[in-house]
């Protein structure tokens, strides 16, 4: 389930926020949300906040596509989170996860590496709040998580 970039149909986060403020709800799709492709790994991702994007306490949801055999170094996050395998498979800290599997993680507890299966993997990640940026741990140099590129596109809590 590879995500396709549909730049012509994308909606800005400001537009989504304006509609949400005016109507109290908004309907969108992953194809309308801004997307980032990580050059280092080929990972494609989109994100939104549950509620207004400037609310640091709001849950933050990411949809990620990991290309076949993609590897991401061990890391952690400053908030609790949950991951759901939508398609494909992914090895996390030595354990294979498959479509429908759910992994729940606590803040500041490291995991990884992540290795996508031969068919790739589509993952839905729900962070408890805006403190989602990955923090590299161990021997990795941070290049496979490239938090700065994600932060350039997606909002995070101010203290992240």
Question: Which role fits each region the language model picked out?
Answer:
Residues 1-56, 141, 151-160:
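A short, N-terminal "cap"/entry segment at the start of jelly-roll beta-barrel domains
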Residues 45-51, 57-76, 96, 106-110:
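Conserved short histidine dyad/triad with adjacent acidic residue
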Residues 52, 67-68, 88, 128-130:
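Non-catalytic surface loops within mature trypsin-like serine protease
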Residues 67-70, 77-92:
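Glycine- and acidic-residue-biased ligand/ion/polar-headgroup-sensing regions
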Residues 79-81, 138-147:
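Short intrinsically disordered coil segments
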Residues 96-99, 107-137:
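Ligand-binding loop in jelly-roll beta-barrel domains
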